[in-house]
Amino acid sequence: MIENIYTSRILILNFGSQYAQLLVRRVRELGVYCELRAWDITEAQIREFAPNGIILSGGPESTLTIDSPRASPYIFMAGVPVLGVCYGMQTIAIQLGGKVNQDMLRREFGYAQVVIIADSPLTRNIQDLINNNQPILNVWMSHSDNITSIPPDFIIVGRTTTCPFAIIANEKKRFYGIQFHPEVTHTCQGHNILKRFVLDICSCQGRWTPNNIKENIINHIKEQVGKENVVLGLSGGVDSTVTAMLLHYAIGVNLTCIFIDNGLLRYNEASNIREIFSKNLSLNIIYVRSEDRFLRALAGIYNPEEKRKIIGRLFSEIFEEQARSLTKTATWLAQGTIYPDIIESAISHVSLTNVIKSHHNVGGLPNTLNLKLIEPLKNLFKDEVRKIGLELGLPFHMLYRHPFPGPGLGIRILGEVKKEDCDLLRKADLIFIEELYKAKLYYKVSQAFAVLLPIYSVGVMGDSRKYERVISLRAVETIDFMTANWSHLSYDFLELVSNRIINEIDGISRVVYDISGKPPATIEWE
């Protein structure tokens, strides 16, 4: 029997917090389904979602600003527990009769200690240490506004030396506010506080597990598609790979995958995909060799944004050409869209933020094929997709490979993209990755790759002078790829990689290491 994984559900309202997606992931890690919606959600939408509990996220605005976001009044009449985090706590206070002020002497950014001064189901028996018989929580604060008086029927549960209302509660209505961020790892007991709210106070059941998700998706595909045929663009990345396997388990030979070799892939990528999917997994795959077509289109193009758009447009055109030959039999187009793509796409429609780079995962495939769309992963985060991949029997090394951008080497070769440059870069990148594996560092860094720079440098090989290309190595460590630190790889390791690249690859005279964080730099160079 397939369990209903959506029986228990938490609704998280986004007030603009940089940690909003992380908050969703933390709840799902508890085995409970939840969704992130905009703060201005309507009463009808809340009723339709029917949450067991509601969490109000933090946000960058001041609650004192005119027209600053407010929660729907219905939230406080829905009869379910509510937890306000940072800004979410402050809007609860204002909307229910409390007061908020901005006191520069009481603002807190970074580490703080919350002293628990009253018993509450939210924090009972949860502490990092005890001082004078009082439990203490080590937390992460990020606020300028402060509550100066709490609403009627609320009590103070916790305080810091500068914030007298760090945790507040209305136990009768099960309304709670915390001034700190439980979703970040810096708040040591954040997991336990969220667990207490979600599982105990909201009485949710933990049915959101990788195996249950897998079985539900496969069953849903069978019901949705039936005996009809599906076409999928297969890239070899995690999302399209897991999508292909879910469809394969659900509809078998009725799935046809299209793999486009654009000449911008990693070393032996195309042959590895053919080996894994066609021979080992018996998927029906159409292979399209299009290297010459992509390189011709990229000839003379130096602007990175233009390169991204050309690669995306050409991929879409070639996919459409191949898919049209299947439209007599196929009625569905599958995509490996994941939940962050949906969230970011929705945000972009209302955001005034400047586009830093074109995103290569959203809206990339043609909508002119008159095929129905199926997106099996659209409710999942990347870490959930990987866990489902393991449930499907896919190898760990395939699922946990470092991210590879949609435009491929096209944005790791700075300037014009040529075949000989792709070959140089592939070899350098392979050496870097090989040595990371040998040193057992590959899974300790979040992403690592080589970049071919558009400059030449003088070198000496034996008694001869050479004037050849420069490679930059890039390795970063990150949790969410929104921010990243450069990896402090040892000098000995970097020397080993540099020597191998220069000695083994004809055409490289110098290797440098990128020590830029994000921000100010982006992870990819283009």
Curated annotation (Swiss-Prot):
It catalyses: XMP + L-glutamine + ATP + H2O = GMP + L-glutamate + AMP + diphosphate + 2 H(+). GO terms for molecular function: ATP binding; GMP synthase activity. Keywords: ATP-binding, Glutamine amidotransferase, GMP biosynthesis, Ligase, Nucleotide-binding, Purine biosynthesis. Pfam families: GATase, GMP_synt_C, NAD_synthase. Its EC number is 6.3.5.2. The active site is at C86, H181, E183. GO terms for cellular component: cytosol. InterPro entries: Class_I_gatase-like, GATASE, GMP_synth_C, GMP_synth_GATase, GMP_synthase, GMPS_ATP_PPase_dom, NAD/GMP_synthase, Rossmann-like_a/b/a_fold. ATP binds at S235, G236, G237, V238, D239, S240, T241. Pathway: Purine metabolism; GMP biosynthesis; GMP from XMP (L-Gln route): step 1/1. Residues 208-401 form the GMPS ATP-PPase domain. Residues 9-207 form the Glutamine amidotransferase type-1 domain. Coiled coil: none annotated. Catalyzes the synthesis of GMP from XMP. Homodimer. This is GMP synthase [glutamine-hydrolyzing].
